[in-house]
Amino acid sequence: MSQPITRENFDEWMIPVYAPAPFIPVRGEGSRLWDQQGKEYIDFAGGIAVNALGHAHPELREALNEQASKFWHTGNGYTNEPVLRLAKKLIDATFADRVFFCNSGAEANEAALKLARKFAHDRYGSHKSGIVAFKNAFHGRTLFTVSAGGQPAYSQDFAPLPPDIRHAAYNDINSASALIDDSTCAVIVEPIQGEGGVVPASNAFLHGLRELCDRHNALLIFDEVQTGVGRTGELYAYMHYGVTPDLLTTAKALGGGFPVGALLATEECASVMTVGTHGTTYGGNPLASAVAGKVLDLINTPEMLNGVKQRHDWFVERLNTVNHRCGLFSEVRGLGLLIGCVLNADYAGQAKQISQEAAKAGVMVLIAGGNVVRFAPALNVSEEEVTTGLDRFAAACDHFVSRGSS
């Protein structure tokens, strides 16, 4: 018999780049999880906006099992039917003409930045290599993407960083305009800064970036790793704004919990990538592609996307009610089912402590920095699960406030 696994084993065996919760989930169904002791949690964290259809969705299990009974992997020397079907679904549903598949959002952003550099070098020369990104952004953990993310805490220990990356203030078109010029090859931006505090871009800001990119022959990259696949109430957030990027990255919810990422591109942009210019061993894996294809089938419907907007209203109404009682938050903001509760000045920096109280009360939430409690639940979360989970969250907030004032 194998030895029992405990949370302490993490501290003994794992490289300590995470500080996971003190409990270990072992089973999930819908928006509920149970830990090793059988305690139930309502999951409003969603695997950080990954579990778009909740845990153990029966149709996703069926898609995975069906493909698993056929074959698992061949490598990029061969294509497969599931990945081609998935590519066609993404092309039909978006602006894109071409798709590159990988395993994560970081890989998708890495591919986008490499493509942008190559596009500029091929068309205009090697002097056109500048990348403009934004402060408090997050684009992944590779050296290139962590450098593009405007959070020094994630990159400062890994110098020297890739050059020619500059950061403007988010939602400030004048700040961006001061950096974007004819040496810029790309601008990369999140339509909603997720890790940066759940901050939606303004319409004028994204339209302004599109105009600046057009003026200076730079590619506009939308990082929709967190906002994509129905999270905001549209299949992709760019559809809210009426701004079409040249490149778009997607991952997280695309696999519903199975690792998959993709770079979507126009024909013109994709044309600079030829055999051998980029690649990945596992990207386009038939298991991942079969699951992602079913995810798109289930999410890209008017009923599901309209339901996300309805659920947004459920959350915001109830969170405002909670806040009216406990007075923790200065603002509830976001789009669709990516929602942030901003702590007021009296509780600044204590988002982690609130998330820990929430877990004790039986509800899982996220943070986005020290000042924002973040919600990214399943897109099909039921009204009963919302009510139960937010009742537990309210109890956690009450306990947190009373403990602080006692």
UniProtKB/Swiss-Prot annotation:
Q: What is the lineage of its organism?
A: Bacteria, Pseudomonadati, Pseudomonadota, Gammaproteobacteria, Enterobacterales
Give the species: Escherichia coli O17:K52:H18 (strain UMN026 / ExPEC)
- Alphabetized UniProt keyword annotations: Aminotransferase, Arginine metabolism, Pyridoxal phosphate, Transferase
Assigned protein family: Belongs to the class-III pyridoxal-phosphate-dependent aminotransferase family. AstC subfamily.
- Source taxon at top rank: Bacteria
List cystine links. Answer: none
Q: Does the keyword Protein biosynthesis apply?
A: no
The protein's matches in InterPro entries, at most eight in alphabetical order, are given as: Ac/SucOrn_transaminase_bac, AcOrn/SuccOrn_fam, Aminotrans_3, Aminotrans_3_PPA_site, Class-III_PLP-dep_AT, PyrdxlP-dep_Trfase, PyrdxlP-dep_Trfase_major, PyrdxlP-dep_Trfase_small
Report the EC code(s) recorded for this entry. 2.6.1.81
List required co-factors.
pyridoxal 5'-phosphate
Q: What is this protein called?
A: Succinylornithine transaminase
Gene3D superfamilies for this protein: Aspartate Aminotransferase, domain 1, Type I PLP-dependent aspartate aminotransferase-like (Major domain)
For this protein, what reaction is catalysed? N(2)-succinyl-L-ornithine + 2-oxoglutarate = N-succinyl-L-glutamate 5-semialdehyde + L-glutamate
The biological processes this protein is annotated with in GO are: alpha-amino acid biosynthetic process; arginine catabolic process to glutamate; arginine catabolic process to succinate; ornithine catabolic process
List the molecular function annotations (GO) for this entry.
identical protein binding; pyridoxal phosphate binding; succinylornithine transaminase activity
Which of the residues bear the PTM N6-(pyridoxal phosphate)lysine?
252
Pfam families assigned: Aminotran_3 (PF00202)
From the UniProt record, give the pathway where this protein acts.
Amino-acid degradation; L-arginine degradation via AST pathway; L-glutamate and succinate from L-arginine: step 3/5
